């Protein structure tokens, strides 16, 4: 086997001053340790022979230690090496002057003397020490605790760990096409937000986010919907909004099949299945799916309402509530039902309305099995079973299931009626009452009975009507007449008792129903809010207008099954049917004579008077 000549210069690496200054302390320490170990490995082969040239057996290679140029390295090695730089003329004698064992017995300190070659007049010598590790495995890996005899082996082993880590980091970095994207991603992990809004002080991790945020202050909304004209700050918001018009719902839940327009809605929906509610209120312990829900909920405890309407001064917990409220003033209803053409203030109202057409009631009570269109309806319904009424009026102490019920109730005390009809000027406590009232003017009756086809303005009226086709549980003990509701029986019994608890302050006239008093008071005020568009005639009641309109149309929807005679009013049919049945429920107290209708009894009593 040929002899190979290896010098220390072959295995040494030199840095320029500029390169050295670029290294951090850890890299300098690593450089020092590796160079010392390389030198140790070479010198440990034969300490007593000349370091200049040593020929070994044929099985070994030949090493030569010549021209130890450590001028750069000499300034950086361990202080244990008492050395200020060997020049090109230094020759190592390789004499072992002494050995000192460390206290732990882990290292051997070898003192080596190197003498400079004679120059013109003098020679000098320099002494340094070298720490050589023993055969014990002194170097332990911090990652896996594996032991090594030599530092170089440990360094190589640790490099393997680092390569594994770096491959993961590179994988992560490769998800970003450009360096700025990686920097922005790092800011997400560190929480750094260097870009601050001068208007409100809010900080952002990206300049693009800051630019979009500043549009809130400038009210700039460059992205406009061609369908409804609504404008948005971001293009992504417009894209999501357009799905309201197209009906596109690309995000489908694999568990229940429900689809969503927005990815965020889909993510939140999945928490319904998992039951995850990571955000808990410290005041009452209530938990929420969203962090923003917790923030809004905490405003209930604090009473904070940061969003105020400039038109009427009303304040709201949520910005979205203010947006919807402002549409009450502007009359804007951008969300239109494709089935019936009805328009709504917000998308959630449209979604809930569409369930009327589909009959979908996805929220079911586990106590009684009752189903609901809205999740909030189920929440309020559950309080019927539990008896919980968390919202209490400070004026009268009355408690309510929902906060909206409390707000509406408080308007009774304040007299506030913010919802005004543009047709007749009548004002209402809540928007729902106004919507139902407007159907009187439009003639709209969206709630139809499947049994007989009769339609109603309110779903409550339809519910009451449907009970007519079913059982009548409430019977009058006086005359045997049965009723669907207990309240109907109560009002009916007042006919027998003569009780009229609702009294007019103007003329002292009394009434059985509160609604009768309200309608009567319009006589004193001269108010007739229901006007016929055909002839201009006005009426106190909406029902009177409906009956009057049949005069123009000739419609007589109430037909007698006995004789086939038809009537414009249901009350006329009821009175007519008493001719066939012979029923006379109204009795004169003075003479005992019976009559078919109250007007006949009234005329008769005048004879006695």
UniProtKB/Swiss-Prot annotation:
Mind listing the GO molecular function terms for this protein?
DNA-binding transcription factor activity, RNA polymerase II-specific; RNA polymerase II cis-regulatory region sequence-specific DNA binding; zinc ion binding
Question: Which residues are in the KRAB domain?
Answer: 6-84
**Which domain of life, per UniProt?**
Eukaryota
Q: Name one GO cellular component term.
A: nucleus
**Compartments reported by the entry:** Nucleus
- What coarse category fits the chief subcellular location reported for this protein? nucleus
Q: Give the InterPro entries listed for this entry.
A: KRAB (IPR001909), KRAB_dom_sf (IPR036051), Znf_C2H2_sf (IPR036236), Znf_C2H2_type (IPR013087)
Q: What positions belong to coiled-coil segments?
A: none
Which Pfam families does UniProt cross-reference here? KRAB, zf-C2H2
Biological processes, Gene Ontology terms: regulation of transcription by RNA polymerase II
Query: What are the UniProt keywords, alphabetically?
Result: DNA-binding, Metal-binding, Nucleus, Repeat, Transcription, Transcription regulation, Zinc, Zinc-finger
Where are the zinc-finger regions (C2H2-type) in this chain?
A: 139-161, 164-189, 195-217, 223-245, 251-273, 279-301, 307-329, 335-357, 363-385, 391-413, 419-441, 447-469, 474-496, 502-524, 530-552, 558-580, 586-608
| Similarity annotation | Belongs to the krueppel C2H2-type zinc-finger protein family.
Q: What does this protein do?
A: May be involved in transcriptional regulation.
Annotated protein name in UniProt:
Zinc finger protein 571
Question: What gene name is given for the protein in this entry?
Answer: ZNF571
